[in-house]
Amino acid sequence: MAREVVIVSAARTPIGAFQGGLAGLTAPQLGSVAITAALARAGIEGKDVQEVLMGCVLPAGQGQAPARQASRGAGVPDAVGCVTINKVCGSGLKAVMLAAQSDRKS
């Protein structure tokens, strides 16, 4: 039987300007800010996360697995699976779609 999928929290990465105040931070570091905020807003801890699906428009130069780097920076345990979705403008929406499809099967 399929379970209902709900969004309990949302946060996005900070938006900056080229060579602006956020220039010294990597995309995974900014992702950590978003994950930390989403967890706080939902009232859950990193240990309660089952999977991290995160869109990343331009992963070049970010190192391996930007979603993993972001989740670790937010205190999510290493045992939690992470997926980086590289789909340019649609990566965030694709993350929501994959999460909904994955959860409904369990």
List the predicted regions and their residue ranges.
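Conserved "HGTGT" condensation-loop signature of ketosynthase/thiolase-family condensing enzymes
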Residues: M1-V80
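Active-site nucleophile and cofactor-binding loops and adjacent substrate-binding regions
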Residues: C82-S91
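Glycine/small-residue-rich loop that forms an oxyanion/phosphate-binding "nest" at active or ligand-binding sites
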Residues: M97
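Conserved small/polar residues in nucleotide/adenosyl-binding loops
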Residues: K105-S106
